[in-house]
Regions:
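Phosphate- and other anionic-substrate recognition elements at nucleic-acid/protein interfaces
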Residues: 1-190
């Protein structure tokens, strides 16, 4: 089984790809992560399965949306199923830009025929922590409990709070795990 979880954004999109058998448990080590960043020091490899890459240069918004969607499609192609975090209803700022950006990706996924599951952000947070309004720090704390890995100390040790790309990796992990658990639940029912 190859499935993907996407934490999609304009500033730091992240993809988590799980490759394993239905009988194998979902673990951090069976996942590969890819994220985009504007920060040069994050455009590198971490922990053997996390890949940071720089954004492509762009001159207009649609060019940016296309390059992010193309990058994401390059990562998820070959997946049997994909999950993406839905829109946050409390979003502020460039909500139309976020919607246009995400729409380009959803259209590209639709054209491949790969099933796409859209998961509300509150469902991802509740799945991970038991609280639908968990913040980035709470999500990271739960990730550390579940995996034994402190991404903040490995990737952003100079930051005082959990931020990009750590929060995006954590979110993508739980989006992918949410999809995995749903697939396994349906598999065991049939």
């Amino acid at each position: 089984m190859i499935i993907s979880g996407i934490d999609y954004s304009l500033r730091s999109p992240c993809v988590c790809i799980f490759a394993g058998l239905e009988k194998e448990s979902f673990t951090f080590n069976r996942c590969t992560f890819y994220f985009l960043t504007d920060t040069k020091k994050y455009a590198t490899f971490f922990l053997n399965n996390i890949h940071g890459e720089r954004f492509q240069d762009w001159n207009q918004d649609f060019q940016r949306y296309k390059s992010i969607a193309d990058w994401t499609m390059d990562k998820v192609i070959g997946s049997e199923q994909i999950a993406i975090e839905g829109y946050s209803m409390g979003s502020k700022g460039k909500v139309f830009h976020i919607a246009e950006n995400t729409g380009v990706l959803k259209y590209k996924i639709y054209n491949t025929g790969i099933p796409l599951e859209v998961i509300p952000p509150t469902s991802v947070k509740k799945f991970a922590t038991g609280k639908g309004n968990a913040d980035k720090d709470q999500m990271h704390q739960q990730f550390m409990r579940d995996t034994g890995i402190d991404l903040k100390s490995k990737i952003t040790p100079d930051k005082t709070k959990v931020s990009n790309p750590v929060s995006d990796i954590v979110d993508a992990y739980y989006i992918c795990k949410f999809l995995y658990d749903k697939i396994i639940e349906n598999y065991t029912r049939s």
